[in-house]
Amino acid sequence: MTTDDRLNELGIELPNPIQPAANYVRHWRTGNLLFISGTGPTDRSPKGKVGADVSLDDAYQAARDVGLQILATAKEALDGDLDRIVHAVKVLGMVNTAPDFLEHPKVINGCSDVLVEVLGERGRHTRSA
C-alpha cells in the first residue's frame, strides 16, 4: 500500500504546505536527508497556554495538525512522493504551557501518532518534548 493509499484509507487530506513566515526556507534536501523548518499550529488552533486557556485534548489536536503540515511539506519537498521517506528521525516539540503543566509529551503525541498512523514503522522517531 502506498502512503497516499494509506492517507485515503484513514480519510486524511493533507493541507496545503505553509509558506515561510520570515527569511528562511521551509525545507532543505541534502543528499538523502530532508530537513523541515519548525512548524506551528494552524490559525484554527486555539490560542493560549495549555493547562490554562487550552485543554490537553485541543493541544493534542493542534499537534496532530502540525504533524499533517509536516507531511504536506515533505510531500512537496519529495516531488509528491511520500513513499520516498525511508524513516522519520526526530520530532522536536515545543508547547506553550501554564507554569504547572507537566504533560508536554501527551501534547506532542498528537504529532507522533499521526506520523505513525500514516507512515507506519517509517514514522517512528526519536523525540524531545
Predicted regions, residues:
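Short, polar/acidic, helix-capping and beta-turn segments at strand->helix junctions
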Residues: 1-129
